[in-house]
Swiss-Prot record:
GO terms for molecular function: double-stranded DNA endonuclease activity. Transmembrane segments: none annotated. InterPro entries: Rpn/YhgA-like_nuclease, RpnA, Transposase_31. Upon expression has no effect on RecA-independent DNA recombination, cell viability or DNA damage. This is Inactive recombination-promoting nuclease-like protein RpnE. It comes from the Bacteria.
Amino acid sequence: MTESTTSSPHDAVFKTFMFTPETARDFLEIHLPEPLRKLCNLQTLRLEPTSFIEKSLRAYYSDVLWSVETSDGDGYIYCVIEHQSSAEKNMAFRLMRYATAAMQRHQDKGYDRVPLVVPLLFYHGETSPYPYSLNWLDEFDDPQLARQLYTEAFLLVDITIVPDDEIMQHRRIALLELIQKHIRDRDLIGMVDRITTLLVRGFTNDSQLQTLFNYLLQCGDTSRFTRFIEEIAERSPLQKERLMTIAERLRQEGHQIGWQEGMHEQAIKIALRMLEQGFEREIVLATTQLTDADIPNCH
């Protein structure tokens, strides 16, 4: 199917009617299930834009999106009315994607709660009755497993409540889990023995270790970083040279970054003085080698 948004005659007449509030109100009063209808104050119908729908979906939709206030005035419900003049097998999943996009748009407006979005498919194709399931979970190879996965709470790995002894048994992921669990601890020295044990097992490569140490420098207690590395190195002689090499590499990178940041700050100070003395903008740029975006910060 090509990504064309050109409406068919079927789509055009459908939208002409459904874009009219009075017509849409009658449609919803007649076709919404009673429990849902009772939740909606249909006198508050408001036509919503659909430009937020991702580009890959727009070609497939002849959609109408209405919002209504709830009967108690405490929230909103959205009704997606989709038109089809021929049956399409994966329509349920597309409607689900549309519904979640509408939910996201609602939250982007600043609302905390996720709104109900009611998808309705209006169908008048040659094949009758409509031949496909409109439960999107039926589109999976294993619908029963899909129901179990998507109608229950999602899986959670809350490492904050996993005992350290249990984490130590997690093979190649143990070091990451242990460090991230304790990264906010005031002093990581107490973790040295466990970390050393994990390093001796040989599950961590140099790239991972350097990234992990850099993470400790950025998010942990930097004042104790050197002692932390030295303690680990002393407890694992076979890893000592490797650990100290990585630590030194990080220090050099840190010095280089600090030097570059210092030079940049100095250039900004020079630019500020030049601008104050009336130098042309182009001369300031050429002299300091700052980018054009840096100059406004100098005013």
